[in-house]
Swiss-Prot record:
Domain LRRCT: 252-298
GO annotation, biological process: regulation of postsynaptic density assembly
Signal sequence annotation: 1-31
Species annotation: Homo sapiens (Human)
Protein name: Leucine-rich repeat and fibronectin type III domain-containing protein 1
Amino acid sequence: MAPGPFSSALLSPPPAALPFLLLLWAGASRGQPCPGRCICQNVAPTLTMLCAKTGLLFVPPAIDRRVVELRLTDNFIAAVRRRDFANMTSLVHLTLSRNTIGQVAAGAFADLRALRALHLDSNRLAEVRGDQLRGLGNLRHLILGNNQIRRVESAAFDAFLSTVEDLDLSYNNLEALPWEAVGQMVNLNTLTLDHNLIDHIAEGTFVQLHKLVRLDMTSNRLHKLPPDGLFLRSQGTGPKPPTPLTVSFGGNPLHCNCELLWLRRLTREDDLETCATPEHLTDRYFWSIPEEEFLCEPPLITRQAGGRALVVEGQAVSLRCRAVGDPEPVVHWVAPDGRLLGNSSRTRVRGDGTLDVTITTLRDSGTFTCIASNAAGEATAPVEVCVVPLPLMAPPPAAPPPLTEPGSSDIATPGRPGANDSAAERRLVAAELTSNSVLIRWPAQRPVPGIRMYQVQYNSSVDDSLVYRMIPSTSQTFLVNDLAAGRAYDLCVLAVYDDGATALPATRVVGCVQFTTAGDPAPCRPLRAHFLGGTMIIAIGGVIVASVLVFIVLLMIRYKVYGDGDSRRVKGSRSLPRVSHVCSQTNGAGTGAAQAPALPAQDHYEALREVESQAAPAVAVEAKAMEAETASAEPEVVLGRSLGGSATSLCLLPSEETSGEESRAAVGPRRSRSGALEPPTSAPPTLALVPGGAAARPRPQQRYSFDGDYGALFQSHSYPRRARRTKRHRSTPHLDGAGGGAAGEDGDLGLGSARACLAFTSTEWMLESTV
């Protein structure tokens, strides 16, 4: 196809057509759509796109790929994807500041070969990986400040080590940097590392940074700064005039000792740095402290392994070495052959100065040297290690003798190869044998010269494990502990000595012995606390239950005994009339009831007596007429007892409230003054208890009850009361008067007559009173 006029004009445009072509290109550029809410400035020959504060959540996909400057600041972009900046080969300046970027895809900037400035400050980046900044071979300015970066990979800056001029990593969480990579940035002008957690700067980092004009290490955790020609250059030393250099390291906990003396000798105009340690220089201005106060202390070894370490060949050993000084000493170890030891498959040096030898060999026998060094000097301490070679055990027999118990033993015994003879066995004695220990004795080995130590090896006949014990050559006894009870053991003692012929350690059997530990008797252990507590609870509960049962049994017996008596009394008193007004009477000074005296003939009262017969009890009541004329009242019960303990009689007496006529009425037949019996009347009788043998006397006007001051209460009740429920007051004064009296004229009142009053014995009265 032949080229048209337009294409030929582009290939060789005449001078008169140049303005027209510029306008045409601008029109074509304006034909590319601009993303919404963005500002596109097409000023030839550059294309600038401004999308600041537009609320973008991601990089707009409609961005012109020919853009030269792209600013996406103050948005909400959370991630940078691989396709966001693809094919933007003309992009020179990219600003992504003040977003929420936390992820950057690998190779996201790989097509930005012309990019000179990348601003990713004020985002949420946590780390910088080596594949994230790949392809930025022309980068000059990298701004990563005010993020959350904790780690930077060593290969992260490899793409622009020779081109970068400005590196900003301030306000992050960095504890370390790839100082080796930083030292290769030969065109670096500004290094900003302030407000991080950096506590160490590798020595020689700034040697090649001849173009560095500003180093900001403010507010980190630096204790010291390594000597570097960078700082010397700022003082004007050298053949070339110095480049202006500003170094800021204020806000660091500087340890002002001899290691910072080189920095103190420099001339500085600022006076912002202070010392944190040592204590006598705390909070003092660094540049105002005299040089003679920047001191160091030589190391002093404070703790080391014992003067001699004994270890069996093949076992591990640890050699400790501690040192103090200012600055803190560094510990190194030197092997017996003069080699400087480091970390290897067999040895390891810890940070605290401990040397671990995992597998010892015969070459390790000798003196190890601990060297502690710092800026003020060094200190050494020897540690001797003695490696005991493994004993040369005899080969196992072709046909081992049968064992009484299952198991095997590889100890040389008199009946097996490797043992000397029966005399060797006799030289070894097992004494003080218990269930878990035994004391082994053997004589001195004079025929064997140069004995270095003794080796005791033993095991049980049912155990395949062989136990070794190394003891000094001066010992002739050994106490073996931690044995199992009731088990047979084979034990041999070997002497380790130097064989002059081979110059190697050799062993010789001193003797062997077989023994059986005692059985483990069942120990008598005291009862535990919770067992004693349970026993006490059971015992106390048993006592309480027994007491309750005894109390119940006593109540049942008492109820049965007194319940039968109450029932008999109730049966005998069912026919008695209703009574009231209780009064207590005693026979006063009466001495007994051997013979009951008769009532006087002139008395106006007649006593009623209960006549008992063998067929059925009959009650004969005798009444006497009363002179007083009183109203009719209910019968009254009067209980009395003689002081001499005589029986108490049950009689009927008229109540005080009864009238004269009604009181004269008798229940049963009565005698007239002439002695003749008269028929009974229909008036109800009055029941009372009078003391047997007591003379009849007029009834007192004042009543008394068995309960003392509760007489009125008894007077207000008209229901009958049992005689056993009442109390007896023997101290009533007006009832203890002259009580005897002469015997009545009536002979029927005597004790010898066939008719007898119903009486309560003294024993029954006391039982009833107790209840």
